[in-house]
Amino acid sequence: MPIIATIEQLEAIYGQPGEASTVKVANRITPPYRVLIDKSPFAALATCGPEGLDCSPRGDRPGFVRVHDERTLMMPDRRGNNRVDSLRNIVRDSRVALLFLIPGSGSTLRVNGRAQVSADADLLASFKMDGKAPRTVIVMTVEEIYFQCARAIVRSDLWNPDKRVDPKTLPTPGQILADMSENRVGGEEYDRAWPERARQSLW
């Protein structure tokens, strides 16, 4: 199987991007890009570390990623599985990327930059939700930001409610855990307890 191994080979196949693909790139958060961030309730956080790459889902109420200034984003580290893979990566390699999604919109927003992890008490308190503060906040310096064309969203028909997958056709978290652990953890009881456990630990 022929493998593409050089930039020249790639450009011979794809050519050069059009002006619209390059002029949209900024090194700061422009007013239109701020609107997209403020409207987004979900982002994927990509990080890298000595063990490899990680991509973590991040979600909260719209605007959960705070625009501190035109070069700085702040994102609370809400409750999760406590693996802290992303944070472990950031403290050793500051390179990060974010991909914002906005329900109903074909536009996605890509942000590349560097990040630090802060446990400043006043900063944590400013992100309290239902009286609960995050344990840390990710502070990101924006180096590159631009919106992505809508073709992937259009092709996938992502926001079409008629295309939603029936959850009953998917393995449950309890089933996956039972399969991976030879039934030591997970199972039906895990799935039964999950909704209430999640409700009590969202923040």
Residue ranges and their predicted role:
Residues M1-W203:
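Binding-site signature for planar aromatic cofactors or substrates
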